[in-house]
Amino acid sequence: MLSDGLCFNFPSTNMNYCEFVATLPDDTDNPNQHYHDTQYGFPIEDDNELFERLVLEINQAGLSWTLMLKKQRAFQTSFKGFDIDTVAAFDEAEIERLLADAGIVRNRLKINAAIYNARQIKQIRQEYGSFKNWLDTHHPLDKAEWVKLFKKHFKFGGGEIVGEFLMSTGYLPGAHVETCPVYREILACRPKWAEAV
């Protein structure tokens, strides 16, 4: 859930993500620390990685982000490295394979959305050259405008999913509080949201 549209609040706590991660014990196997420190909010250049993040955000709906991070490798394997062309070609046999895979979220609507969205990204690439170029071309938009655009092109394009996807990939601010050391690292990577400030 977004707090004032500026920073992710970790569910069932009153903390933002940075504060939540800071409370984790050093010996934990919780994957949030690594994700917070090395991925969350950092710009992504590769279309397949952008697609992966979108699929994970979609699958997180109604579940915890910690669960998504724990299942990330299984998702990568099951979705063939999130190769957009490969996923776009998935047929009913592939859908049945995914529905039988206990390593991922076995939700037909979410699986169908991933395949549909891969096909949409293929069409976007024909016009813009890449999914990233499409995102860059439409930047800057506010969250409401992004949601409207995503709903026009993708399945599962609601406000929370789109907001988190764009925050986690550097298109919207708010992944980290300004006092978080990772915030400066992200600024050094020149995220798109910083261009609009």
Residue ranges and their predicted role:
Residues 10-197:
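HhH-family (HhH-GPD) DNA N-glycosylase catalytic core used in base-excision repair
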